[in-house]
């Protein structure tokens, strides 16, 4: 395989499912960015969101950019919806090569004050959904005959928790799930990796409002002193799904501007 060309991502003509691919209004979240970038590289994209209008907004952007995409409404915590989602990709596009799992919710409690029902819901949305989407996507990838690749979105909270116990546990489970899937399905030619975003500025983050001070604090958490965006995560996803990552599986790509390395100042005692 000749990978000398920087443009040869191996995505042209392939089919990707991007769950959580919608966004508020014209905002660019992680999933929407990934869907747009995959389409720009020639992939056909099934954009999945619980709210059909959010998925349709992403599809409209892709088509305006000259790409091919279709919208699908699904609750990825529902097994039947996950089955139907994969069936839709196979029916509309004839094959399936990639899955990008973006769906997730947050929580702020400790083990003492987090209600058990909240813990269970976070684990269902953040972990079980990826189990279910993969359960049906992997056989379709095998049927399509060229292997495939999956990217699951974790978080730096899995690597260096700052409290947020339930959320951190769920995102750690995403990494372990991905590693186990990589072992199980490597022989099928299917690669499975994670992206662990840092404090990126996306519609999910600012939906309920964010002060300039809070936004600045998030930016300053980066060693680079810059703000992460949905595009940064989308580019990482596209790379891991592409031929450029053909020898990478079971890994977690941290995209945080160095935030996980942040500690005491160098001259502290």
List where the protein language model places each region.
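Short C-terminal tail/terminal secondary-structure segment
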Residues: 2-7, 238, 249-269
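C-terminal helical subdomain
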Residues: 7, 176, 194, 213-248, ...
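Canonical Rossmann dinucleotide-binding motif of NAD(H)/NADP(H)-dependent dehydrogenases/reductases
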Residues: 10-46
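Substrate-binding pocket helix/loop in short-chain dehydrogenase/reductase
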Residues: 110-111, 115-120, 218
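Active-site helix of classical SDR
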Residues: 134, 170, 178
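Alpha-helical segment proximal to the catalytic Tyr-Lys
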Residues: 139, 183-187, 246
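Residue(s) in the substrate-gating loop at a strand-loop-helix junction
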Residues: 155
